[in-house]
Amino acid sequence: MKAFMLAGVSSGIGKTTISMALMSVFNNVSPFKVGPDYIDPGFHEFITGNKSYNLDIFMMGEQGVKYSFYKHHKDISIIEGVMGLYDGMDNSLDNNSSAHIARFLGVPVILVLDGVGKSTSIAAQVLGYKMLDPRVNISGVIINKVSSAKTYAIFKEAIEKYTGVKCLGFVEKNDKLNISSQHLGLLQASEVEDLREKLSILKNLVLQNIDLKEIEKIASEQTRTFNENETEIEPPLYISYLKDRYVGKIIAIAQDRAFSFYYNDNIEFLEYMGFKVKYFSPLKDSKVPECDIIYLGGGYPENFAEELSNNKEMFNSIRKNYEQGKNILAECGGFMYLSNGIEQIEGKVYQMCGLVPCVVNMTNRLDISRFGYILINNKNDIEIARGHEFHYSKLKAVLEDTRKFKAVKKDGRTWECIFNEKNLYAGYPHIHFFGSYKFIEEVF
């Protein structure tokens, strides 16, 4: 089995662009992303033509992470890390960080750092990352934003002399490779201007300056192997009892430019449970397809508020399905769409579906008070789901507060998070089904 993780010393260090480059030069790549992000997997899929899967111990459990990683492995698995290598939910080393995932799965780590404003000191940085947790196999480094091959040679000599870690190459500074940031991290792949041109430049830089044969050797020789007959590639026992429970049922999923944030494992799990999946566009279609359940995921409805607001036929179709008693699950952007309206930053309000009695007020700042991983408890204060919140909006004009589920943070903070009126479940949390099977049973 060939696999490696590309992890950074911090956010903004260039691991996403270098991950994209490496995914473009290897054949039949299985891409993965540590953490709950939806944006980077979209880039992975654009580049490789294969689905990208999230690896998140908090939301999926250890068995869920193992299952997804082994099940979806192709010729070579490339895992893109999140934030800095050791950054996670707390300051422990078992904190759902990139290092934690790499150690748990037994994959080597290639560390990305930049070469700006340093020379020999770069070795101290690598040594610190190597020594903090010796159980993490840091097998090589790639240096980003290097001014010249001569400068790289200085870095390489210092790192290999003082740390014993191999230098695998470098990427030169190039302003043409900049990709603007938005919300969760990066623009969606379809929105990046001249993305193919940027990738072509990046691919050429990688082919010139990075030792791909050595990376493939590391991926092949230093990854823990597994037996295909092991239970590791079977669904986790805690969700396997739901297999085929919903055979004959149809779930309609919103999928278009406004709604695209779904975990691939969630969609496949719906099929595993027996659902037939149908897709529809709240932007362009006039009605929801014939179904038993409606699922509206996250995205950027605020960017398409006028178009969504003008599609009254779709509003009527969703309301009709609700009145017929069909269950509706809406996450973040989907929840915003079901509200009474979206108020843009400049003050204009666009009418939405009107099933959730509130208005969503867009802001230009991330709502830090509601940011990050959460447990979701029911009215009896029993955990039934795990997810995360990340939104640039707040609620206003809540006419009737029907929130019946509570978000619980690790530091003890709580808040009501999911509106539940009859057969409607709508709120900001993004939920991973592997850690939310009790919630799934209630909703589905």
Swiss-Prot record:
Record-annotated active site: 332
GATase cobBQ-type domain residues: 250-438
Requisite cofactors: Mg(2+)
Keyword ATP-binding assigned: yes
GO molecular function, one term: ATP binding
Pathway: Cofactor biosynthesis; adenosylcobalamin biosynthesis; cob(II)yrinate a,c-diamide from sirohydrochlorin (anaerobic route): step 10/10
Keyword Transmembrane: no
UniProt keyword list: ATP-binding, Cobalamin biosynthesis, Glutamine amidotransferase, Ligase, Magnesium, Nucleotide-binding
Superkingdom field: Bacteria
Site (Increases nucleophilicity of active site Cys) location in chain: 430
E.C. code: 6.3.5.11
GO biological process: cobalamin biosynthetic process
Recorded catalytic activity of this chain's protein: cob(II)yrinate + 2 L-glutamine + 2 ATP + 2 H2O = cob(II)yrinate a,c diamide + 2 L-glutamate + 2 ADP + 2 phosphate + 2 H(+)
Domain text: Comprises of two domains. The C-terminal domain contains the binding site for glutamine and catalyzes the hydrolysis of this substrate to glutamate and ammonia. The N-terminal domain is anticipated to bind ATP and cobyrinate and catalyzes the ultimate synthesis of the diamide product. The ammonia produced via the glutaminase domain is probably translocated to the adjacent domain via a molecular tunnel, where it reacts with an activated intermediate.
Entry similarity comment: Belongs to the CobB/CbiA family.
UniProt miscellaneous comment: The a and c carboxylates of cobyrinate are activated for nucleophilic attack via formation of a phosphorylated intermediate by ATP. CbiA catalyzes first the amidation of the c-carboxylate, and then that of the a-carboxylate.
Function: Catalyzes the ATP-dependent amidation of the two carboxylate groups at positions a and c of cobyrinate, using either L-glutamine or ammonia as the nitrogen source.
Name recorded for this polypeptide: Cobyrinate a,c-diamide synthase
Organism the protein comes from: Fusobacterium nucleatum subsp. nucleatum (strain ATCC 25586 / DSM 15643 / BCRC 10681 / CIP 101130 / JCM 8532 / KCTC 2640 / LMG 13131 / VPI 4355)
Lineage: Bacteria, Fusobacteriati, Fusobacteriota, Fusobacteriia, Fusobacteriales
